[in-house]
From Swiss-Prot:
The active site is at 166, 192, 289. It comes from Bordetella avium (strain 197N). PANTHER family: PROTEIN-GLUTAMATE METHYLESTERASE/PROTEIN-GLUTAMINE GLUTAMINASE, PROTEIN-GLUTAMATE METHYLESTERASE_PROTEIN-GLUTAMINE GLUTAMINASE. This is Protein-glutamate methylesterase/protein-glutamine glutaminase 2. It catalyses: [protein]-L-glutamate 5-O-methyl ester + H2O = L-glutamyl-[protein] + methanol + H(+); L-glutaminyl-[protein] + H2O = L-glutamyl-[protein] + NH4(+).
Length: 351
């Protein structure tokens, strides 16, 4: 079996050693070299031609972002960022994903060694996903490069969009939200992310989009023109009802499909609370989280969309949904916003 060849770039010798130990403990991958900074890494990449690079976000001698930007321009390859759990770390990580990094893993703040060893399976999963990922170019940043804003059909506040994503999802979500007008239907999103990063992600999207994007809070009313992002790591997000209103419910619970928040938990709750007033959307991601939930939504009368293989970074979750017969339609990412708004224009049903 051909192993996934990995180079680890981190200024901490401790982290380099731990990453090597973790990666080499999995039979399908190996560390072929490590580097303390991007300048050393540049030579090692030429020498070893790795399948995946793990890259520390904040490093001396050359900033991780500068290096990533040059790498994606000159020699694109799958990169998994290793990030500290700080606000600055969160902002830098969001920018790294925009520049083309496939995914990221957090560095635990305390007891680095124990934390990283606990993360062994997660790190291995992310490296496997990265090795199979379809590379994207950097996201456009100039205002001129932003897509034309779509016009909203007449909406009822009963209609809402329920969306799930994982690997590659941050940029896919950005692409879906950017063209939406300010009077779009409410959107609830579960994107697999650790605690501490969803706030940075929501703030980043809020500055770019016409809709209001924020991290969801328990008990808040769901309003049109708003996007609610499930907080990372600690709780599941559900859609509930309070009288005639939809509300956000955040609740503790065991991980589902190894994820918390889980897309399936959100989708199953939407099937129950919104029925045919919901539009279910499943975007790029590894694994099967969301597939069964999308089927439940479809059976409850929702219209369901899955991202097509050609536009996915990792065609895992949408593929599982399609195999289950859970998707009414398979849609390329660039057409997704328009399809959502077209379906949202259908009349809402009072529940």
């Amino acid at each position: 079996m051909k192993k996934i060849r990995v180079i680890c770039v981190d200024d901490s010798a401790l982290v380099r050693g731990l990453m090597t130990e973790i990666i080499n403990s999995h039979p399908d991958m190996e560390v072929v070299a490590t580097a303390p900074d991007p300048l050393v890494a540049r030579e090692l990449i030429k020498q070893h031609n790795p399948d995946v690079l793990t890259l520390d976000v904040e490093m001396p001698r050359m900033d991780g972002l500068d290096f990533l930007e040059k790498l994606m321009r000159l020699r694109p390859m799958p990169v998994v960022m290793v990030s500290s759990l700080t606000e600055r770390g969160g902002e830098i990580t969001m920018r790294a994903l925009e520049l083309g990094a496939i995914d990221f893993v957090t560095k635990p703040r305390l007891g680095i060694r124990d934390g990283l060893l606990d993360y062994s399976e997660l790190i291995a999963d992310k490296i496997r996903a990265a090795s199979r990922a379809r590379l994207r170019g950097p996201a456009p940043v100039a205002a001129a490069a932003l897509p034309a804003r779509l016009r909203s059909p007449l909406n009822s506040s009963e209609k809402l969009v329920i969306l799930g994503a994982s690997t590659g999802g941050t940029e896919a979500i950005r692409e879906v939200l950017l063209p939406l007008p300010p009077d779009s239907p409410a959107i609830l999103i579960t994107q697999h992310m650790p605690a501490g990063f969803t706030r940075s992600f929501a703030q980043r999207l809020d500055t770019l989009c016409a809709v209001t994007v924020r991290e969801a809070t328990h008990g808040e009313r769901v309003l049109p023109g708003h996007v609610y992002l499930a907080p990372g790591g600690e709780q599941h997000m559900k859609l509930g009802r309070s009288g005639a209103n939809y509300v956000i419910e955040l609740e503790a619970g065991e991980p589902v499909n190894r994820h918390r928040p889980s897309v399936d938990v959100l989708f199953h709750s939407a099937a129950q609370a919104a029925g045919r007033n919901a539009i279910g959307v499943l975007l790029t991601g590894m694994g099967k989280d969301g597939a069964a939930g999308l089927l439940a939504m479809k059976r409850a009368g929702a219209y369901t969309l899955a991202q097509d293989e050609a536009s996915c970074v990792v065609f895992g979750m949408p593929r599982e949904a399609i195999l289950l017969g859970a998707a009414d339609e398979v849609v390329p990412l660039p057409a997704m916003s328009e399809r959502i708004l077209m379906r949202a224009g259908d009349r809402g049903h009072r529940v």
